[in-house]
């Protein structure tokens, strides 16, 4: 996990690779403008702070460490650090050749939701009904898998000990160029490009959190 100075991660695919599901224009704007802006602002914010400079990104935005700094700085770290962390996860979950969930994640989903279709409906319903900018997450904690939404660039790890398995960006910049105000269409399209099999590694990481 990155530490200061933070860098914009290179995508694992070309900007036009997800067309027609996501246009090249949207991908370029999303990655090179929005994501990069969060990285630049985060670097400027934590520059010169020895404590913050040593923290990996996921620890920087964690509940434990946010509680150790002043409220104004903590809010900015949630915004800029969360923006960097959230977008990094988002771009990593997309794939030109998505695969179905692996054995570990499949078992957890079946145990928690009954089957994948039930989980898919709950996730999409929560994402579609979320008001304003934010994110929809699949989170693993000691309580098992849960679907959560957060406002703005907040992440579940700002508030609890958990591991975000995947998250979908609900800000308009993620879909407005392609879908205008049709958020439901965007969620349906992006869902088809999620590489679920990769998340077994995150499930393994989460075992250290539970």
Would you name each region that the model predicts?
Residues 1-210:
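Feature for soluble, non-membrane regions of globular proteins
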